[in-house]
């Protein structure tokens, strides 16, 4: 057995030193041991802004199943900006246990570009996801308890819209029946579980401005409908106050450190394929107060994380990126160029690599459409050849796009200095963010605009269920909400096998869900699951612990 981390013997700095390095006093933080802390919300309310706080958005092309290293690149970039004499904080999402124990492994970076203590962060961290799970499941318990004790609100059990949650990949819980037994176990009805980070409670946590806003949004969660088709909200069940209480610490961002002892803020964990895919507004705003450059990682490709950052996060918070880093790997380009072949992706193949440029080209175009200038960044692997790197650089130069190579995995900040310098240069230019759609557009029109503009779809096909959802949105008078597209991360389309830059395809909208508390509409496209399953050879089979408490990979 060997250690999973090159940094397990590194001596971490006390988190109070990290806090001090960005202008936070001991009164501004709440300690969770020596190396983790919560940041007080008073920092956002009372502390004067010390820095300019330009936001750098890190995104990618459509990834392979193993990811392309956005987190590693984001951490390396932030460390490199600090090395150049500026103040930078990287803000990331908290890893979910499901993917950590499933296919993807940890989400704390890699090599010598990590956030630490990585094992704690990847496992239970400060308990935020547990709190989200508890708040969600309190609401679910309250619904069934209300029905059991007389059902004063006349809730139709078949019209309940909130599902239970857990932070684990477990396909057996996607669809279940509850209340079975002798009649003393509540109403028998169909239910199901979603992974906690896909819950509306998680989205609300990341989009709230403060505790008061959090409580109000929780109260506005659309629980379901009565038998006479009246909407029922969480506030009608009078549990939104207790839900907010469960989240009173979870709403505070978490301060940790990078492998070069620079500050990192980790908070919230919404997936980008089934949610909006960015850490919390509170975390980013606090980081803006304390640094010159805030490096923000947006989940999956620019068709998901970056699109939603602009159309949901920027629209709601006024946080606008000054530059965008587009992470690519030779492996991902060849994956798209070979239309999904997983063999020989680490061998030089210039023709296949160049075929994959079509996917990169569309993502560069999308960032321009959103008003962002891209710095295409190759996350370099040992198998990358000079010829492959030269081809990518030439492709970018021909299109007037900045290009950099990041070797942060192997070299830390030293391997990302060129990237950092180019990011600072691009961020100095004034940009105007463009929204893909207007608030006033009908939801159907918003969907068509994203599908055609960002994905390149020829048309959109709505199922009967989706059409009913559109009608319900009009009845509830929430057409002004932004949309959160839920689709595969592997393709620009809703078909994970349709790689490269597909054209003339029809985007299939199968379902419309209303996240009334989070204030966005979830648009389910294709076969997308809100509760993942485990693969045959999942990561947990290879994880172990040694006698000193260190994680080992079997």
Swiss-Prot record:
EC category: ligase
Keywords of the record: ATP-binding, Ligase, Nucleotide-binding, One-carbon metabolism
Pfam family of the protein (one): FTHFS
GO biological process: tetrahydrofolate interconversion
Reactions performed catalytically: (6S)-5,6,7,8-tetrahydrofolate + formate + ATP = (6R)-10-formyltetrahydrofolate + ADP + phosphate
GO molecular function, one term: ATP binding
Disulfide links within the chain: none
InterPro entries: Formate_THF_ligase, P-loop_NTPase
This enzyme's EC code(s): 6.3.4.3
Gene3D superfamilies, per database record: Domain 2, N(10)-formyltetrahydrofolate synthetase, Formyltetrahydrofolate synthetase, domain 3, P-loop containing nucleotide triphosphate hydrolases
UniProt binding sites for ATP: 64-71
Pathway: One-carbon metabolism; tetrahydrofolate interconversion
Classification via NCBIfam families: PRK13505.1
Family per similarity comment: Belongs to the formate--tetrahydrofolate ligase family.
Protein name per Swiss-Prot or TrEMBL: Formate--tetrahydrofolate ligase
Source species of the chain: Caldicellulosiruptor saccharolyticus (strain ATCC 43494 / DSM 8903 / Tp8T 6331)
């Amino acid at each position: 057995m060997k250690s999973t981390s090159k940094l397990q013997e590194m001596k971490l700095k006390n988190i109070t030193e990290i806090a001090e390095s960005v202008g936070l006093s001991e009164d501004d933080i709440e300690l969770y041991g020596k190396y983790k802390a919560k940041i007080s919300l008073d920092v956002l309310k009372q502390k004067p802004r010390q820095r300019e706080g330009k936001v750098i958005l890190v995104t990618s092309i459509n990834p392979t199943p193993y990811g392309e290293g956005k987190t590693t690149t984001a951490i390396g970039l932030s460390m490199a900006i600090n090395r150049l004499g500026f103040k930078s904080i990287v803000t990331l999402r908290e890893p979910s246990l499901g993917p950590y124990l499933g296919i993807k492994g940890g989400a704390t970076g890699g090599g010598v570009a990590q956030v630490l203590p990585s094992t704690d962060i990847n496992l239970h961290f400060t308990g935020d996801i547990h709190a989200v799970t508890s708040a969600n499941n309190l609401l679910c318990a309250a619904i069934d308890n209300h029905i059991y004790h007389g059902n004063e609100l006349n809730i139709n059990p078949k019209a309940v819209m909130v599902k239970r949650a857990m932070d684990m990949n477990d396909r057996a819980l996607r669809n279940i029946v509850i209340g079975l037994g002798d009649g003393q176990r509540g109403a028998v009805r169909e239910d199901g579980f979603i992974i906690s980070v896909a819950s509306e409670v998680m989205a609300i946590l990341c989009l709230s401005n403060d505790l008061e806003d959090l409580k109000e949004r929780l109260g506005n969660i659309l629980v379901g409908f009565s038998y006479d088709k009246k909407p029922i909200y969480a506030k009608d069940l009078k549990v939104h106050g207790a839900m907010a209480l469960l989240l009173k610490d979870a709403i505070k961002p978490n301060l940790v450190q990078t492998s070069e002892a620079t500050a990192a803020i980790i908070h919230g964990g919404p997936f980008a394929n089934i949610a909006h895919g960015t850490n919390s507004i509170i975390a980013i705003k606090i980081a803006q107060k304390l640094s010159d450059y805030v490096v923000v990682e947006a989940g999956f490709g620019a068709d998901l994380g970056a699109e939603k950052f602009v159309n949901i996060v920027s629209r709601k918070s006024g946080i606008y990126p000054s530059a965008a880093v587009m992470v690519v790997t030779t492996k991902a380009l060849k994956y798209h160029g070979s239309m999904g072949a997983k063999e020989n992706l680490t061998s030089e193949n210039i023709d296949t690599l160049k075929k994959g440029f079509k996917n990169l080209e569309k993502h560069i175009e999308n960032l321009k459409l959103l008003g962002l200038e891209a710095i295409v960044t190759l996350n370099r692997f040992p198998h990358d050849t000079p010829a492959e790197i030269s081809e990518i650089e030439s492709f970018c130069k021909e299109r007037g796009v900045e290009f950099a190579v990041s070797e942060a995995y192997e070299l830390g900040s030293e391997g990302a200095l060129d990237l950092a310098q180019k990011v600072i240069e691009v961020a100095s230019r004034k940009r105007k963010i463009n929204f893909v759609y207007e608030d006033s557009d009908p939801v159907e029109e918003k969907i068509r605009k994203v599908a055609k503009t960002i994905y390149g779809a020829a048309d959109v096909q709505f199922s009967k269920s989706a059409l009913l959802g559109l009608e319900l949105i009009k009845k509830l008078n929430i057409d002004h909400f932004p949309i959160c597209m839920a689709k595969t991360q592997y393709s620009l389309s809703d078909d994970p096998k349709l790689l490269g830059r597909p054209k003339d395809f029809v985007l299939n909208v199968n379902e419309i869900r209303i996240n009334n508390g989070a204030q966005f509409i979830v648009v389910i496209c294709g076969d997308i699951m809100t509760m993942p399953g485990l693969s045959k050879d999942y990561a947990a089979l290879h994880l172990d612990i040694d006698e000193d408490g260190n994680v080992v990979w079997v």
